[in-house]
UniProtKB/Swiss-Prot annotation:
Binding site for ATP: A324, D325, G326, T327, P328, G329, M330, K345
GO terms, biological process: glucose metabolic process; glyoxylate cycle; tricarboxylic acid cycle
NCBIfam families: PRK02946.1
Pfam families: AceK_kinase, AceK_regulatory
Classification via InterPro entries: AceK_kinase, AceK_regulatory, Isocitrate_DH_AceK
Record-level Gene Ontology MF annotations: [isocitrate dehydrogenase (NADP+)] kinase activity; AMP binding; ATP binding; phosphoprotein phosphatase activity; protein serine/threonine kinase activity
Gene Ontology, cellular component aspect: cytoplasm
Enzyme Commission number: 2.7.11.5, 3.1.3.-
Annotated organism of origin: Xanthomonas campestris pv. campestris (strain ATCC 33913 / DSM 3586 / NCPPB 528 / LMG 568 / P 25)
Lineage, top ranks: Bacteria, Pseudomonadati, Pseudomonadota, Gammaproteobacteria, Lysobacterales
Active site: D380
Catalytic reaction equation(s): L-seryl-[isocitrate dehydrogenase] + ATP = O-phospho-L-seryl-[isocitrate dehydrogenase] + ADP + H(+)
The protein's name: Isocitrate dehydrogenase kinase/phosphatase
Transmembrane segments: none
Cited function: Bifunctional enzyme which can phosphorylate or dephosphorylate isocitrate dehydrogenase (IDH) on a specific serine residue. This is a regulatory mechanism which enables bacteria to bypass the Krebs cycle via the glyoxylate shunt in response to the source of carbon. When bacteria are grown on glucose, IDH is fully active and unphosphorylated, but when grown on acetate or ethanol, the activity of IDH declines drastically concomitant with its phosphorylation.
């Protein structure tokens, strides 16, 4: 696009803006790296509470540095903060600074965020933002990510794995490095026996160690004669010392490790885009936005999610946005494009009884989720502001519902609809529908995992509030995940009570409690009434997870959590652990 030259003073100002934004992103990136690098020490010293604090602090960095950059720019802009011609030239100068950078897309997203704050952009503004819906940004990345490569001679797999573990030293020694290597080798040979007599010919592992919760991961891939698979070695540092706990080679298992229902990894990567390219070779079906997000680059994940969705949206002009499958919510209106696996959630203007929270409280719940260890049970929900859709793309029923129920979030601009705030999540099959649709064995397994999901969340100080099946979904790996957060709270905030024994016939037959119930009172013995499970599945859940219905179990767990004693929740089944 040809730009009109600016007066010399304005040109210098545009150059200064570009330089200031560039330096602000570098400052952000340096602080991001500093926090991320602490993950190794947290792991070595078993400082799990410090690791949780770092995860929360790192998420807050982005908005902090955007705000700080706006303060820096006050002295440069001198009353020209909304001068479009100035920002157009600043974008040109900024782009020149990014030439040759692997992670220039991260820099561009930072710049876009800044301009949207200044201009309150509704939709996108191609004149002052970096917009490229028609490209896949990682396609231009050809520099290989830093990695270790190991050749494997027949019969010497254990020897090679001893060398691998030695190349990733920690301040705490391995409990028994050779024994760990031998256990990994046995599992690899067992998992890959169908590849032939000597299945592993070489191994590649990223130099950067990935950390999350209580584990460190060596992430890479292994090659046979004609094929390759992921290879992720999970390390733990517990009372037994530093040791290898598991090795994952199936793509489905690694995909669950990188699931967007988990918290972000702490991986101190020099550059991110080349790592995303590598990870995509392992997880070919994983959307690029989820990979950026799982590496802690949530804003870039949002950018890529927007880019890929709207590219698909424009390529299917006849398809309409419709209500998502499932029971309509009292707090949210949820819609989707049937051919694309996302849902868009808008807060209703008014909530039906018995919902009593405010709009601000609902937004606060969704913000809280970002600060929690989601342990594979809470679906990532990214907020988007001022999305623009053609009005004609909404089905009549959906448009009418949005106009009548979500007027505070909706406005019209000519032939377009603007959405002030919505939350975007991966689309899952609602659990209540899934249980009706599946054969008995699959439904039984899903019901049991639903119980396990509640237990996993509880052990990480998360209480879902509303346990109805419609608030849970099933992933493509048949895992139950919670995704409706308006009643979510912390276990440590609740009061878990026994249900009083009736003392009269009237109390026994009362439809409502005959005793005072506080706003945070929870009665686990009554959970079965609110789950909505068919009787056979409910009995199975009670048999497999009886503690869920025991008030004392919840009180004991609450006491542990208040002492910052969080039970460990491994991201894989016990059967996957090494002998």
């Amino acid at each position: 696009m040809n730009q009109q030259p600016l007066p010399p003073q304005s040109e210098r100002r545009a150059l200064a803006i570009g330089r200031a934004v560039y330096e602000a992103f570098q400052d952000y990136h340096a602080q991001f790296s500093q926090i991320t690098a602490r993950a190794r020490q947290r792991f070595e010293t078993r400082d799990w509470s410090g690791a949780r604090e770092d995860a929360v602090a790192r998420i807050a960095l982005y908005d902090h540095y955007i705000s700080e950059c706006m303060l820096r720019l006050r002295a440069v802009l001198l009353g020209q903060a909304h001068d479009r011609a100035l920002w157009m030239r600043a974008r040109t100068h900024y782009a020149e600074l990014l030439t040759g950078l692997i992670d220039q897309e991260l820099y561009k997203t930072f710049y876009n965020t800044l301009t949207r704050r200044y201009f309150r952009t509704q939709g996108v503004d191609a004149q002052i933002e970096f917009i490229a819906l028609d490209i896949e940004p990682t396609d231009a990345i050809t520099v290989p990510v830093a990695r270790h490569t190991y050749a494997v001679s027949p019969g010497r797999l254990t020897e090679m794995l001893v060398r691998v573990l030695g190349d990733y030293p920690f301040e705490v020694p391995y409990a028994h490095r050779t024994r760990c290597a031998a256990a990994i080798a046995v599992r690899l040979l067992d998992d890959l026996a169908h590849w032939g007599e000597h299945p592993v010919r070489s191994v590649e592992l990223l130099e950067t160690v990935f950390y999350r919760e209580r584990r460190a991961y060596l992430v890479g891939r292994l090659f046979g004669e004609h094929r390759f698979s992921p290879c992720v070695i999970a390390l733990v540092n517990d009372d037994a010392g530093l040791r290898a706990e598991a090795v994952l080679t199936r793509r489905s298992d690694v995909a669950q490790l990188f699931s967007n229902s988990r918290s972000y990894f702490q991986a101190d990567l020099t550059t991110v885009g080349d790592a995303v390219v590598f990870l995509r070779s392992l997880l070919t079906h994983k959307p690029i936005d989820e990979l950026y997000t799982m590496l802690g680059r949530a804003k870039q994940g949002k950018t890529e999610r927007y880019r890929t969705f709207f590219r698909h949206f424009q390529a299917h002009p006849a398809e309409q946005l419709v209500h998502a499958d499932g029971t309509p919510g009292m707090v949210m209106v949820v819609f989707t494009l049937p051919s694309y696996p996302l849902v868009f959630k808008l807060i209703r203007d008014r909530f039906a009884y018995p919902k009593t929270m405010s709009r601000a409280q609902v937004e606060g719940k969704y913000e809280l989720v970002f600060q929690l260890d989601r342990i594979g049970r809470l679906l990532d929900a990214q907020p988007y502001r001022f999305l623009r859709f053609p009005k004609a793309r909404f089905s009549p029923a959906l448009l009418q519902d949005l106009q009548s129920s979500c007027a505070m979030s909706l406005s019209e601009d000519g032939d377009d609809v603007l959405i002030a705030l919505c939350y975007v999540q991966r689309r899952l099959r609602p659990l209540n529908l899934y249980l009706r649709e599946q054969l008995p064995a699959a439904a039984h397994a899903a019901a049991l995992d639903y119980g396990q999901a509640i237990k996993d969340m509880a052990r990480n100080n998360i209480f879902p509030g509303d346990m109805l099946l419609k608030n849970f979904g099933i992933t493509r790996h048949q895992r139950a995940v919670f995704y409706d957060y308006d009643e979510l709270c912390l276990i440590t905030e609740c009061t878990f009570r026994d249900w009083p024994t009736p003392t009269s016939y009237e109390e026994q037959m009362a439809a409502e409690p005959w005793f005072h119930v506080g706003p945070r009172d929870v009665f686990p013995e009554r959970f079965a009434l609110f789950m909505g499970l068919p009787s056979s599945q409910l009995e199975a859940v009670k048999h497999m997870h009886p503690e869920l219905f025991d008030p004392q179990w919840w009180r004991d767990l609450q006491a542990r959590l208040r002492e910052d004693d969080y039970p460990d929740t491994p991201p894989y089944a016990d059967a996957q652990k090494l002998a």
